[in-house]
């Protein structure tokens, strides 16, 4: 009564009246309902949102938006609406003053509405000030207000049309005005305002339109339509991609994760410590001393907490970093889940409506509209949820990749050994992807149980306790699923381990491919890879069987639940009739149940995979980091005299291992030149590493003053232009740059590079000779203009002439660096008289230290060494005056030896070999003009081929290739089993509709109940058998395909010529063997199953709808056309985006690989931040392609679900229209199938697109499986006899060589005959073509003209392995592979242990190997990093001694060893290869002075040839080189 008196003065107006609103053919709301509920609903909505929204806006300030016409209009309309509401209020007061009694509601409602309009106007301005361009809150408010007003408007129009109707002119007029203004506000809210002032998007040339899109555009993903149209018209390119939103960039995302991880690590380390007793501090002890007195150590009794340090939780860190944004997805998911159950409830109402012939028609249309609206709301909620999940996943991946990269720059060398390059690449590719995938599913952990509980609740309402039978079936399945999840985790760990090992091995193979080819070891390593792959495939096969059982249980569970529930329902009580309402509402609920039951195991599997990845990532991120603070760095401005001070320092490579350097103490004054000498493995390089803080300092104190530059023993070259390699992030200073180029003898090289210093010099410098690479490395250091220079034997890779030039111009007392502090590790003795201090290393300790003269006077080990190995002509007495003390100018010593060293991996003598350095350094001055000319060239010459994206539709041949890889029988068997499964599913549901239409007999039971139930069960069993069959077939077929495609790729890559590896960045190949192969292994079989399932489900649903309502044939074809068009529209762009994403992924890995190889150089130059920035840019470039692809997915899904919702609408509408001619069973069947079709359509396009985007992996594997191949390895017809070559006679006949078709000749018309057993030296300036000659001999590069004849056999006519097994090389780069030492010597296990030990003894390694705990089984690290360069060179000598072929080639083989070891090696070669033909490329001429002949090469031509003594008499090139080396 109170409410009635509130609504009307006489109390006659109720709030609700069923007869007015429902039981009528012309429904309406009561006046009270209109004035209260319909007026208050929008007010309550806005006031309930206001507190949270105000808080959100106060925390998210995006900038200030200037007042625009749009904003002014919205504000003005807000005020007008307020005025209208208050006009109504004042009118009511006026009426009261006139004695007209009005209901209180006419005072309350306008007041409430007026205040709400003021709030709306306030929010419009607040949003503008906070930079909100389009508001969802406000648009929803105006929409709700309009819908409520629409109901009132309809009522007013109806009442106005009635005869004798009372019209309230003022209130009706204000209402019509109110309605119009609300409509205009709604329309205006659909548009977006301009960007805030100073917004980053204003300056961005290609900003993402999302940030400026309207709310409607954002929820429907309309803002990406422009890109979709562009992609449909022509293939998308990287230039078409938008910039990332600021909040998605690495710059924003990575630091937050890294900082949170650091905090978590600090927390986990903090443990309560209680000091029971601590001795008083000794005041005499120096402050900050790191030495703890032994007695003190004993006295300090510390009782620690008994708990160990807990592991830091990476999950907690990820949640803290990304949780707040991700939590929004909870709301959308909850809304979607609740809306999902509206479908079955409305279906129930529709079936009731069809059964009730008396119900008015408008109710049927109302239910249909309700079904459509609920489906549309469900669509919008679901895809906002997915969007948040995918964006969260993307951010997690970006953060993980960034964190891994940053960590890789910090970890210790010991940690580097425990995490190989392959493992770290997997962390960035596979593991980061696992987190990304999990972000999509993680909400299902709470959502799936919620859906199951709600479904069971509604089923209970429909079928009663019979539902417990279905629950029992589900409970029975739980332990089975749990067991499978545990097994999946086990297999996942095993799979990842095998994959890591395979990627690690492939990395090594790709890094050492040249050595494999020279030794003809490809087959041995192919077998190694295949054995790992076999293990991987075994695990995959077990996983596939598990997946088949899983699919069987997951797909069958909903049917078994339905069958058991229906069976119990009809059998427990004969009067329980399974009518259409019970059956199809239950079936709709069972269909809802199907999804959480299917998805839960997948979620569990995804969580299992992610937990494995989480652990791997946590272990990596928890690795020990280098402690740069262990070395004290001081400013150059600090007044102390010494540049480097080391006091009693002990260093080790890994904690817990014996120290490598012991008790090191020395001081170096500013500007001094210090040489470090000693035998192989004595700790010279380790000393430099210790100064760079690359080693673990056990004790002692080290101080460095100023910045440091470092030139490593193995030159590290970036895949960039020559100029960028030298500048290394510093700005270009033209004059200084030219001076550095001249000093480092690089000017002549610019003449022969296609674009001068802008020429791209390839990954790891593959188109430079060893000497050129080292000079680029040296120039980088010199250009950095640092205070301290650490040189690790840089002069060894160049010939004597260039070495002398570099020493004089750069390192020496008169060089560019004369005022800098320089530490030079060297094996040469010719420069020692000119240095200020010599440090002699022995066994990790400093054995002697002093100036050259002091060490001679001391007559110790150094003096003895000099007397033994200095050139006989050297007059030591004459050198007294030339010894340089501190600050004295020294005169270069002409005689002495220079030990050469060739450094860097994969030395490819490319263009450089077509020219050489001129003999006269004065000519280099004239080459400044060449530098300027080269710099002026606009086009940079490219060596590396970037990973290219294919365009257009994926070729049918790619699908056909995949089908062939699976096997045609398995392919067609799978399709047949899919068909059987879906036919039996359709039949069982149609059978159910017939069952529900069975009329009950007189006693209230159904006559054919048992028969119907038996057939229904039989059809279910048939369905289950088909499911198990196709799951098994697809899984096994997928493994067949994986095996075949990997084998083809591996087979082809190993048979590719060297030119292929020079052009192709290793990142591209690693990407194929890791990410693309993982897609083929794991993704494609799953996608095939889901695609086939979706396709048949859609076809089945359409058939059922057409059977039930044939009139639907009118609407299905047009909707089908819309669907097809949208799908093609999408796939065109999606496919290209996937390709662009794949292509942009390779540079991330390439850059990462490059960084790991040069990490010590990057750290030495303190360039970590620049490299991190470059990595972030590459990751962002990759995400720029990924982000539009996930949005395109949502764009498609929203549009497709709208098509699906239209099918639901028309199926229900036609059922309502035809209700008098349709049975309830058919209506139920038709509408329940139409409810599913939305999901089916969505999945079908998603899966067809996933199919096409994932099959791109097959296309990319195929791309590298069909590249050019080198000549056959074995040719039976022309194979030489086993005794060949018998004498070792080598004949070059008019031989010419070029590296590629488009390049000039590097060897020109060589005509030389070398008799069997001859010892021939090959000499020439750096880049003269010496190594090119050996490449031609091994057919690494095929001849352009002419031929090489060995013992009468033209080598071009025989197989490559026939040739390469019969000749041996000790190459420039001593490459070792991870594995046992024995495997590195004899990968085919052809020789006995005795023979291997003999080879090691002759190579002077027996003592070293015998001292190792595992002897021959000693495990070599990746790249042989746990051996010194000299030891690696000796291992290569041992390989040659094992093979003992008739022809031996030494390519500067003793470069990295000390003079004493070199002498032993030379005598070994002379005695062991006495009857062999030996070709030696030498920079150190004294090693070939006793050879029978010397060939002098210059610019690819033979300039001189004859005995060394003859050539010296000729006074030509050889004479000038010998003079430079101090031999004449």
Swiss-Prot record:
Glycosylation sites: 19, 1003
InterPro entries hit by this protein: AAA+_ATPase, ABC1_TM_dom, ABC1_TM_sf, ABC_transporter-like_ATP-bd, ABC_transporter-like_CS, ABC_transporter_C-like, MRP, P-loop_NTPase
Region Disordered: start-end pairs: 876-895, 909-929
Nucleotide-binding found in the keyword field: yes
Biased composition (Polar residues): 910-929
SMART domains: AAA
Top class in the EC scheme: translocase
GO molecular function: ABC-type glutathione S-conjugate transporter activity; ABC-type transporter activity; ABC-type vitamin B12 transporter activity; ABC-type xenobiotic transporter activity; ATP binding; ATP hydrolysis activity; ATPase-coupled lipid transmembrane transporter activity; efflux transmembrane transporter activity
Swiss-Prot/TrEMBL keywords: ATP-binding, Cell membrane, Glycoprotein, Hydrolase, Lipid transport, Membrane, Nucleotide-binding, Phosphoprotein, Repeat, Translocase, Transmembrane, Transmembrane helix, Transport
Topology in membrane: Multi-pass membrane protein
Chain ranges on the Cytoplasmic side, renumbered to this chain: 55-74, 122-133, 194-317, 386-441, 487-548, 613-963, 1044-1086, 1130-1200, 1245-1528
Enzyme Commission numbers on file: 7.6.2.2, 7.6.2.3
Protein's UniProt keywords contain Nucleotide-binding: yes
Positions of transmembrane segments: 34-54, 75-95, 101-121, 134-154, 173-193, 318-338, 365-385, 442-462, 466-486, 549-569, 592-612, 964-984, 1023-1043, 1087-1107, 1109-1129, 1201-1221, 1224-1244
Record function comment: Mediates export of organic anions and drugs from the cytoplasm. Mediates ATP-dependent transport of glutathione and glutathione conjugates, leukotriene C4, estradiol-17-beta-o-glucuronide, methotrexate, antiviral drugs and other xenobiotics. Confers resistance to anticancer drugs by decreasing accumulation of drugs in cells, and by mediating ATP- and GSH-dependent drug export. Hydrolyzes ATP with low efficiency. Catalyzes the export of sphingosine 1-phosphate from mast cells independently of their degranulation.
Protein name: Multidrug resistance-associated protein 1
Gene name for this UniProt entry: Abcc1
């Amino acid at each position: 009564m109170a409410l009635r008196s509130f609504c009307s003065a006489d109390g006659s107006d109720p709030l609700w009246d069923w007869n007015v609103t429902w039981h009528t053919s012309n429904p309406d709301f009561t006046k009270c309902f209109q004035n209260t509920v319909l007026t208050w609903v929008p007010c309550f909505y806005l006031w309930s949102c206001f507190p949270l929204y105000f808080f959100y806006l106060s925390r998210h300030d995006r900038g200030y938006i200037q007042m625009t016409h749009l904003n002014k209009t919205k504000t003005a309309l807000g005020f007008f609406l307020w005025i209208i509401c208050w006009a109504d209020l004042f009118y009511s007061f006026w009426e009261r003053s006139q004695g007209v009694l009005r209901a209180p509601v006419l005072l309350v409602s306008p007041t409430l509405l007026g205040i709400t309009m003021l709030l709306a106007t306030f929010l419009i301005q607040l949003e503008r000030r906070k930079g909100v361009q389009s508001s969802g809150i406000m648009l929803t408010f105006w929409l709700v207000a309009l819908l409520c007003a629409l109901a009132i408007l309809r009522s007013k129009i109806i009442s106005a049309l009635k005869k004798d109707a009372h019209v309230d002119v003022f209130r009706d007029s204000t209402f019509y005005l109110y309605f119009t203004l609300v409509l205009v506000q709604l329309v205006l809210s659909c548009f977006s305002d301009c960007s805030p002032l100073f917004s980053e998007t204003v300056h961005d040339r290609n900003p993402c339109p999302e940030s400026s899109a309207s709310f409607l555009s954002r929820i429907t993903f309309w803002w990406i339509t422009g890109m979709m149209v562009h992609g449909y018209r022509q293939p998308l390119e990287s230039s078409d991609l938008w910039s990332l939103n600021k909040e998605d960039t690495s710059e924003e995302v990575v630091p937050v994760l890294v900082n949170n991880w650091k905090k978590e690590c600090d927390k986990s380390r903090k443990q309560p410590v209680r000091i029971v007793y601590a001795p008083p501090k000794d005041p005499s002890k120096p402050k900050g001393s790191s030495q703890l007195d032994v007695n003190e150590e004993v006295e300090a009794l510390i009782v620690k907490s008994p708990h160990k340090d807990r592991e830091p939780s990476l999950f907690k860190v990820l949640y803290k970093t990304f949780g707040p944004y991700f939590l929004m997805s909870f709301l959308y998911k909850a809304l979607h889940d609740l809306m999902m159950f509206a479908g079955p409830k409305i279906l129930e109402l529709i079936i009731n409506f069809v059964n009730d012939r008396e119900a008015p028609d408008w109710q049927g249309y109302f239910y249909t509209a309700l079904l459509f609206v609920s489906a549309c709301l469900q669509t919008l909620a679901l895809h906002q949820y997915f969007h948040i999940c995918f964006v969260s996943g993307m951010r997690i991946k970006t953060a993980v990749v960034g964190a891994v990269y940053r960590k890789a720059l910090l970890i210790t060398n010991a940690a580097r050994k425990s995490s190989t390059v392959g493992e770290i690449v997997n962390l960035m590719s596979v593991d980061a992807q696992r987190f990304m995938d999990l972000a999509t599913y993680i909400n299902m952990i709470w959502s799936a149980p919620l859906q199951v509980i709600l479904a069971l609740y509604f089923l209970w309402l429909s079928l009663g306790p019979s539902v417990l039978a279905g629950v029992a079936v589900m409970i029975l399945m739980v332990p089975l699923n749990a067991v499978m999840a545990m097994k999946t985790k086990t297999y996942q760990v095993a799979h990842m381990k095998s994959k890591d090992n395979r990627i690690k091995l492939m990395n090594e193979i790709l890094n050492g491919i040249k050595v494999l080819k020279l030794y003809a070891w490809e087959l041995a390593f192919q077998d190694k890879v295949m054995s790992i792959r076999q293990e991987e495939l075994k695990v995959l096969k077990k996983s596939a069987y598990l997946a088949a059982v899983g699919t069987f249980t997951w797909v069958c569970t909903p049917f078994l639940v339905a069958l058991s529930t229906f069976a119990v329902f009809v059998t427990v009580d004969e009067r329980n009739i399974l009518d259409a309402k019970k059956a199809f509402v239950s079936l709709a609920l069972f269909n809802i149940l199907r999804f959480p039951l299917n998805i839960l195991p997948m979620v569990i599997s995804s969580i299992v995979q992610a937990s494995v990845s989480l652990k791997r990532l946590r272990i990596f991120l928890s690795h020990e980091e280098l402690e740069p603070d262990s070395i004290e760095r001081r400013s150059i401005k600090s007044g102390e005299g010494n540049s480097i001070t080391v006091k009693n320092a002990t260093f080790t490579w890994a904690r817990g291992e014996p120290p490598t350097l012991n008790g090191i103490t020395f001081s170096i004054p500013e500007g001094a030149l210090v040489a470090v000498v000693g035998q192989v493995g004595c700790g010279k390089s380790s000393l430099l590493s210790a100064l760079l803080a690359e080693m673990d300092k056990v004790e002692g104190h080290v101080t460095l003053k100023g910045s440091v530059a470092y030139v490593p023993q193995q030159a590290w070259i970036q895949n960039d232009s020559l100029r960028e390699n030298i500048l290394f992030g510093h700005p270009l200073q033209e004059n200084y740059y030219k001076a550095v180029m001249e000093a480092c003898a690089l000017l002549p090289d610019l003449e022969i590079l296609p674009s001068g210093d802008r020429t791209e010099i390839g990954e790891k410098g593959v188109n430079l000779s060893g000497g050129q690479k080292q000079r680029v490395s040296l120039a980088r250091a010199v250009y950095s203009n640092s205070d301290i220079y650490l040189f690790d034997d840089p002069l060894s890779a160049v010939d004597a002439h260039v070495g002398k030039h570099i020493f004089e111009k750069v390192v020496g007392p008169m060089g560019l660096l004369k005022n800098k502090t320089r530490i030079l590790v060297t094996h040469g003795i010719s420069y020692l008289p000119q240095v200020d201090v010599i440090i002699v290393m022995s066994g990790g300790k400093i054995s002697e230290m002093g100036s050259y003269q002091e060490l001679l006077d001391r007559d110790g080990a150094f003096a003895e060494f000099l007397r033994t190995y200095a050139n006989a002509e050297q007059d030591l007495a004459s050198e007294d005056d030339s010894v340089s003390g501190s600050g004295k100018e020294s005169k270069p010593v002409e005689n002495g030896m220079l030990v050469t060293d060739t450094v860097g991996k994969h030395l490819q003598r490319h263009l450089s070999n077509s020219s050489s350095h001129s003999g006269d350094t004065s000519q280099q001055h004239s080459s400044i003009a060449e530098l300027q000319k080269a710099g002026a060239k606009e086009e940079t010459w490219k060596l590396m081929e970037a990973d290219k994206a294919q365009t257009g539709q994926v070729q049918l041949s790619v699908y056909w290739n995949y089908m062939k890889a699976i096997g045609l029988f398995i392919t067609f068997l799978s399709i047949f089993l899919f068909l059987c499964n879906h036919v039996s599913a359709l039949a069982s549901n149609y059978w159910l509709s017939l069952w529900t239409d069975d009329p009950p007999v007189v006693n209230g039971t159904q006559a054919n109940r048992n028969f119907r139930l038996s057939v229904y069960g039989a059809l279910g069993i048939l369905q289950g058998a088909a499911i198990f069959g196709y799951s098994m077939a697809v899984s096994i077929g997928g493994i067949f395909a994986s095996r075949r495609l990997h084998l083809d790729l591996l087979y082809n890559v190993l048979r590719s010529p060297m030119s292929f590896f020079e052009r192709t960045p290793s990142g591209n190949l690693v990407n194929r063997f890791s990410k693309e192969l993982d897609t083929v292994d794991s993704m494609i079989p799953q996608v095939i199953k889901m695609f086939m399932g979706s396709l048949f489900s859609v076809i089945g649903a359409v058939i059922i709808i057409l059977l039930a309502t044939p009139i639907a044939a009118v609407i299905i074809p047009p909707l089908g056309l819309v669907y097809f068009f949208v799908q093609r529209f999408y796939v065109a762009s999606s496919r290209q985006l996937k390709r662009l994403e794949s292509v942009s992924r390779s540079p991330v890995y390439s850059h990462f690989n490059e960084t790991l190889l040069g990490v010590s150089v990057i750290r030495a130059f303190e360039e970590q931040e620049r490299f991190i920035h470059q990595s972030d840019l590459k990751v962002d470039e990759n995400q720029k392609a990924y982000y539009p692809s996930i949005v395109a997915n949502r764009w498609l899904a929203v549009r497709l679900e709208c098509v699906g919702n239209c099918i639901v609408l028309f199926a229900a509408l036609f059922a309502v229209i035809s209700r008098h001619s349709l049975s309830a069973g058919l209506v139920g069947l038709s509408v329940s199938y139409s409810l599913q079709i939305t999901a089916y359509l969505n999945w079908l396009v998603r899966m067809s697109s996933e199919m096409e985007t994932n099959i791109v992996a097959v296309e990319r594997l195929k791309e590298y499986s069909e590249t050019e191949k080198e000549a056959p390895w074995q040719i039976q017809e022309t194979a030489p006899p086993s005794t060949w070559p018998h004498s070792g006679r080598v004949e070059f006949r008019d031989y010419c060589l070029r590296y590629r078709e488009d390049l000039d000749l590097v060897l020109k018309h060589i005509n030389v005959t070398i008799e069997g057993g001859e010892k021939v030296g090959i000499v020439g300036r750096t880049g003269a073509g010496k190594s090119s000659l050996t490449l031609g001999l091994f057919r690494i590069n095929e001849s352009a003209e002419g031929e090489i004849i060995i013992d009468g056999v033209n080598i071009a006519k025989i197989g490559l392995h026939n040739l390469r097994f019969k000749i041996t090389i000790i190459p420039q780069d001593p490459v070792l592979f991870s594995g046992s030492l024995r495997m590195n010597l004899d990968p085919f296990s052809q020789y006995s242990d005795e023979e291997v030990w003999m080879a090691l003894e002759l190579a002077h390694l027996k003592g070293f190997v015998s001292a190792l705990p595992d002897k021959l089984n000693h495990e070599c690290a990746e790249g042989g990093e746990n051996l010194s360069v000299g030891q690696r060179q000796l291992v290569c000598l041992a390989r040659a001694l094992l093979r003992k072929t008739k022809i031996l080639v030494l390519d500067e083989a003793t470069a990295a060893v000390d003079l004493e070891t070199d002498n032993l090696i030379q005598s070994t070669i002379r005695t062991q290869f006495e009857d062999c033909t030996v070709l030696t490329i030498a920079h150190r001429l004294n090693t070939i002075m006793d050879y029978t002949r010397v060939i002098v090469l210059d610019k690819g031509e033979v300039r001189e040839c004859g005995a060394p003594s003859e050539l010296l008499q000729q006074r030509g090139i050889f004479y000038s080189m010998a003079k430079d080396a101090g031999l004449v």
